[in-house]
Amino acid sequence: MQMTTRVLTGITPSGTPHLGNYVGAIRPAIQASTATDAESFYFLADLHSLIKAQDPARTQRSTLEIAASWLACGLDPDKVWFYRQSDVPETTELMWLLTCVAGKGILNRAHAYKAAMDKNRAEGEDEDAGVTAGLFMYPVLMAADILIFNAHKVPVGRDQIQHIEMARDFAQRFNHVYGQDYFTLPDAVIDEQVATLPGLDGRKMSKSYNNTIPLFAPREELRKLVFSILTDSRAPGEAKDTQGSALFQLYQAFATPQETAAFAQAFADGISWADAKQQLFERIDLEIAPLRARYEALMAEPAKIEATLRAGGARLRARYATPLLAQLRDAVGLRDLSSQASAVGPATAVKAALPVFKQYRESDGQFYFKLHDAAGTLLLQSDGFASPREAGQLIARLKQAEDTTQLQLPGVQLPADAAPVLAALRALREA
């Protein structure tokens, strides 16, 4: 039976989103949440937000607004896992367990931490000025978010790929130190076609440019903002270019292909900017009006949102987080002292039941793996690899090997007698 793919999406609680957030992130994520071949996890990263936001009222308000936004846009908490990061305390306990195997050198190379230090040096400040331990440890908390549910895939932007690689590294280190594959190694999913919208001034829509159109702006405010979009001086009756037109790009993001083609023809026919803006306003409002109504209803009943988030967290803890933490606590030795004598025998027996691949990182920075048989005898040793993914891909190929020729792969130190290796691989396939 094939395992369902678990997909984890983190949501930054940054308040009410704008149209660019909706088109580029929220709408496609909610569409993806309906996939029947995946188990989807969506969480509000309120603990992460504390790294930058230290205004309690703002943190609370932003969390409420972003939760209401996603629910209003169609996220169904009965079909996906929707929860608040701080409602799953096992995440922070796991963070500590990972911290105890994470290399400080890896954290030193984290982009956000390095950027903060570089900025301080450029300004003549002490390189750690204003840099909190929270910023430094951010990648470990992100790894815990992913590994607490053993997510297989994590949709991220290119600037977050490093954090997924770190999560893989921490997971491999833990698996190696404690001799068992407790964690699945997650993969980053990069959407190369992320939609971006132009703002009121033609630049990318961004709060930092102060050129946004709030997603749930009241109807009249929405109309006013649309009519303030920057256009050129071409008069009614004069053909207008769709290329580079913020007005046209915004319309295209909400319209069907047929509607877009008709709008393009209207540009060629010399539609006035006022009429074009009116059409854009009506097309956006057609999609947004029902979402706005749901958002306003949700914001009027914050207790319902609170109940939804708490219920999601409670169900997740029971299903995934609590059982995994119990297993991990036992693995590291945080055990009931009265059961010490009886626990040693069975644990050893279970551990020795099957052959096992062990992945690890050496001091040279390279990633290696070994194959041991059920008794712990070393059967196979790899060469070093530049990334954990390369090592993992080779292990996957080895697990399918059924004869000696299939074992002859670059990066594998094959023993003279390959029969024990093939027997071990067969045992793993049949397990």
Curated annotation (Swiss-Prot):
Q: Name one Pfam family in it.
A: tRNA-synt_1b
Q: Which gene encodes it?
A: trpS
Into which EC class is this enzyme placed?
ligase
One biological process term from GO is: tryptophanyl-tRNA aminoacylation
Keyword check for Cytoplasm, yes or no. Answer: yes
Q: What is the lineage of its organism?
A: Bacteria, Pseudomonadati, Pseudomonadota, Gammaproteobacteria, Lysobacterales
Sites binding ATP sit at: 12-14, 20-21, 157-159, 197, 204-208
A GO term for molecular function: ATP binding
Listed A to Z, the keywords are:
Aminoacyl-tRNA synthetase, ATP-binding, Cytoplasm, Ligase, Nucleotide-binding, Protein biosynthesis
Q: What is this protein called?
A: Tryptophan--tRNA ligase
Q: Which domain of life is it from?
A: Bacteria
Q: Which PROSITE patterns match?
A: AA_TRNA_LIGASE_I
Catalysed conversion reaction: tRNA(Trp) + L-tryptophan + ATP = L-tryptophyl-tRNA(Trp) + AMP + diphosphate + H(+)
Q: What is its EC number?
A: 6.1.1.2
Compartments (UniProt record): Cytoplasm
Kinase is among the record's keywords: no
Any one annotated GO CC term: cytosol
